[in-house]
């Protein structure tokens, strides 16, 4: 039985391609306080992904719905459109 060593190493291009394909989220929260008094708070969320990956995620969680149209004034827009003809 022989043992084979794997010498496959990922190139930088392969690593970047995988990150853009799968996406990565870095969520950081830091708070600095002195004697119970909050001096500084930092909240950061960094998302690294391709546009295609983000759009697939946004569609899955419902971030792409147009709430402005649903909450708008549909009666007012219909009144304006009634006087116009093309």
Curated annotation (Swiss-Prot):
Subcellular location(s) per record: Gas vesicle shell
Family matches, as Pfam families: Gas_vesicle (PF00741)
Effect of inactivating the gene: Not essential for gas vesicle formation in E.coli.
Gene Ontology MF terms: structural molecule activity
InterPro entries: Gas-vesicle_GvpA-like, Gas_vesicle_GvpA, GvpA, GvpA-like_CS
Keyword line: Gas vesicle
Keyword NAD: no
UniProt KW Cell membrane keyword: no
Disulfide bonds: none
Subunit structure: The gas vesicle shell is 2 nm thick and consists of a single layer of this protein. It forms helical ribs nearly perpendicular to the long axis of the vesicle.
Family, per entry: Belongs to the gas vesicle GvpA family.
Function: Gas vesicles are hollow, gas filled proteinaceous nanostructures found in some microorganisms. During planktonic growth they allow positioning of the organism at a favorable depth for light or nutrient acquisition. GvpA forms the protein shell.
Descriptive protein name: Gas vesicle protein A1
Lineage of the species this protein comes from: Bacteria, Bacillati, Bacillota, Bacilli, Bacillales
């Amino acid at each position: 039985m022989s043992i084979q060593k794997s010498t496959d190493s990922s190139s930088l291009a392969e690593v970047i391609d995988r990150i853009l394909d799968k996406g990565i989220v870095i969520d950081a929260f830091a708070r600095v306080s002195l004697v119970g008094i909050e001096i500084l708070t930092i909240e950061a969320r960094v998302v690294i992904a391709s546009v295609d990956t983000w759009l697939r995620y946004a569609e899955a969680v419902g971030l792409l719905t147009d709430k402005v149209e649903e909450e708008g004034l549909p009666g007012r827009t219909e009144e304006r459109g009634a006087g116009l003809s093309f």
